[in-house]
Amino acid sequence: MDRQKIKTDLSNYFNAEPQADFRGFYSKAFDIVSDLYNSKNNISAMTGWINLPHDTSLYEKIKSFAGKVKEEERYEHLVVIGIGGSSLGSQALIESINSSLWNRLSRAKRKGFLTVDFIDNLDPIVIRNVYNRLKFEKTLFLVISKTGGTLETIVPILVAREWFGEDFYRQCVFVTSEIGRAHV
């Protein structure tokens, strides 16, 4: 067997453009974000999420709901159904805080918190494996979709309804920004 050497060429690594060349870009980006943030036209409706970190009333409502779910001890599992930004933020946060073995810990070791599974694609094996593991009566479903019409969100909901029956909807929390227009 011939051994091949890997050569690393760093000659252009240190020849990066001076930061001054990017100042115009940063200024332009700041102006665009400021315009979006301060706009009173239709664009502001699409960027309402910008203010979410400052909406303490919404945070308090979510915290209160989560506290009730934990206190009632009715649920053991949480299944988050969403795609892209509707799922990735909570998934990254949960995985960065908890052990990768979180779902295998006892409820006592999880201090009463629920196990969490994410269905963020249309893979039938993933969906089947998650649904097979669940005790339906002990599962809360969190369905997140900006429009409520995303195929990758609707399909797992329809599968769950078929799998668990019409009572599935009684154990769902739907989060969408398109109130009144959502398909879910």
Each predicted region: which residue ranges?
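Extended, charge-enriched "interface" segments that sit outside catalytic cores
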Residues: 1-72
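Glycine-rich phosphate-binding loops that contact phosphosugars or nucleotide phosphates
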Residues: 67, 73-181
